[in-house]
């Protein structure tokens, strides 16, 4: 992934903020790729990555048999911090976006649905919390 960042006209504070944002974006993309690979290794078919609806985004949508799984990926220095970063409002947006995905995919109607939280820590290790609710 190549990202061009223009920094010559920015203040030092703005450049630092932009660099943190770029690092966070790259870290998030690496975490999502790691989790996607793990779901594939477990026999899941990946239907979509970073699927955007009108009200939000779902990081990963996979199918295994009659089960459809909507996965939110969180990365942080620690598992606890990553888990705590998922808010009720964010989970609600993910659920609403999942419903929009299903509205646009009538061939998937009737499948069982689940929401997972994949938590990736700084070392790259991760855990999947299956069937999350708040």
Curated annotation (Swiss-Prot):
GO terms for molecular function: nucleic acid binding. It comes from the Bacteria. InterPro entries: Restrct_endonuc-II-like, tRNA_endonuc-like_dom_sf, UPF0102_YraN-like. Transmembrane segments: none annotated. Belongs to the UPF0102 family. PANTHER family: UPF0102 PROTEIN YRAN. This is UPF0102 protein Dshi_2830. It comes from Dinoroseobacter shibae (strain DSM 16493 / NCIMB 14021 / DFL 12).
């Amino acid at each position: 992934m190549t990202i061009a960042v223009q920094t010559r006209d920015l203040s030092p504070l703005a450049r630092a903020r932009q660099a943190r944002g770029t690092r966070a974006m790259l870290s998030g993309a690496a975490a999502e790729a790691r989790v996607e690979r793990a779901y594939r290794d477990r026999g899941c078919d990946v239907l979509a990555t970073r699927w955007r609806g009108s009200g939000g985004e779902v990081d990963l949508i996979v199918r295994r048999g009659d089960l459809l799984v909507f996965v939110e990926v969180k990365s942080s220095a620690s598992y606890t911090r990553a888990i705590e970063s998922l808010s009720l409002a964010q989970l609600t947006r993910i659920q609403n976006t999942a419903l929009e995905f299903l509205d646009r995919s009538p061939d998937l109607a009737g499948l069982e649905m689940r929401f997972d939280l994949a938590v990736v820590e700084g070392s790259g290790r991760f855990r999947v919390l299956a069937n999350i609710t708040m």
